[in-house]
């Protein structure tokens, strides 16, 4: 048991040393805290004093600048009124000239608008007349070709019963008399192209 008692005694001694250390640290913390609070109060007081001083300085500067600006404004107005009359007259004259030019431009634009409309109508009329003329020519030419084809069809229908038509390898073919053309071939069959 004596070892256990020694261990307990050592633990109690260690615990007491820790308590003393914690107490010492707590006292140091309280001292530092009170010192920090005093410095904070001092800093707050200095800030208030600086703020008051800067506020007074700002007001003084503001008043000085305001009075200087007022004086400059009065002087500029007096000088500007004397110089403003010729400039106003020149500006009014320029405005009158601009109005006259705008009126002239509008009149010219309306004239060009009418000319453009007339040219546009004439162009459309010319294009339509050209289209009608071309269409009429194509129709007449087409009808003449159709009439020629119908005439040829009538001729072929008259000659078709005289032709000997058959099938050659599954394709339509016609027997051709080659005596007058070739002289030496007889019974020749020609395939009809589609």
Swiss-Prot record:
Keywords assigned by UniProt, alphabetized: Plasmid
Function field: This protein is probably required for relaxation complex formation.
Name the UniProt record assigns to this protein: 22 kDa relaxation protein
Native source species: Salmonella typhimurium
């Amino acid at each position: 048991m004596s070892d256990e008692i020694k261990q307990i005694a050592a633990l109690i001694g260690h615990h007491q040393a820790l308590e003393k250390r914690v107490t010492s640290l707590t006292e140091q913390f309280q001292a530092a805290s009170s010192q920090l609070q005093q410095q904070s109060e001092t800093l707050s007081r200095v800030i208030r004093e600086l703020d008051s001083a800067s506020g007074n300085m700002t007001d003084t500067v503001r008043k000085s600048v305001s009075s200087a600006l007022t004086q400059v404004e009065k002087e500029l107005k007096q000088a500007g009124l004397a110089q403003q009359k010729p400039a106003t007259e020149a500006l009014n004259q320029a405005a009158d000239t601009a109005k006259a030019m705008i009126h002239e431009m509008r009149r010219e634009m309306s004239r060009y608008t009418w000319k453009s409309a007339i040219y546009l109508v004439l162009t459309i009329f010319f294009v339509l007349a050209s289209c009608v003329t071309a269409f009429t020519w194509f129709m007449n030419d087409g009808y003449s070709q159709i009439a020629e084809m119908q005439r040829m069809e009538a001729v072929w229908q008259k000659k078709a019963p005289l032709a000997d038509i058959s099938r050659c390898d599954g394709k339509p073919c016609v027997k051709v008399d080659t005596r007058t053309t070739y002289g030496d071939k007889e019974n020749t069959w020609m395939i009809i192209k589609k």
